[in-house]
């Protein structure tokens, strides 16, 4: 028996597209940090960075990590100020879910701040690169679980929404 495919919903599609970008960019930054920490040849690091449309290994690794963190912060701020208040009004039964997602946002925000701090102080030393790998690994564990939970939890309500919620 074939399962019916869920109808296309632009809000859910956008959420998944943004989450896909966040996953992809986080994985790229993390892989570059691991490669640098493991002493990968500069050419390999440059090649990975070029895929992120940048140049200059450690400087650009730092820049990409910081930019990724800012993107996630902005995405979560948009959810906290626009999407989540709309869902609270439209689906009061989802209050506990929204509370959990906002608590996750606070944890992820702290982890993003840690990654940013380590990235800003990134030096051409094994210890410095290892700290970035550790920070990105911890962020990955929490952020990827959060993204998966959020998509599953919000899909039913997003499928009922016709337009993007306004912020505020």
Locate the predicted segments by residue.
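Small-residue-biased structural context
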Residues: 1-168
């Amino acid at each position: 028996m074939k399962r019916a495919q869920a109808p296309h919903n632009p809000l859910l599609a956008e959420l998944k597209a943004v989450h896909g970008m966040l996953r992809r960019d986080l994985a790229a930054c993390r892989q570059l940090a691991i490669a640098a920490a493991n002493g990968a040849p500069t050419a390999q690091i440059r090649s990975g960075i070029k895929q992120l449309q940048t140049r200059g290994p450690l400087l650009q690794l730092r820049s990409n990590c910081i930019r990724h963190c800012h993107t996630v912060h902005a995405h979560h701020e948009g959810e906290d100020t626009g999407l989540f208040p709309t869902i609270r009004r439209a689906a009061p039964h989802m209050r506990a879910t929204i509370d959990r997602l906002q608590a996750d946002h606070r944890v992820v925000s702290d982890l993003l701040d840690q990654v940013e701090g380590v990235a800003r102080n990134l030096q051409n030393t094994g210890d410095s690169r290892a700290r970035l790998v550790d920070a990105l690994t911890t962020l990955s564990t929490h952020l990827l679980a959060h993204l998966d939970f959020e998509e599953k939890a919000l899909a039913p309500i997003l499928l009922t929404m016709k337009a993007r919620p306004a912020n505020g």
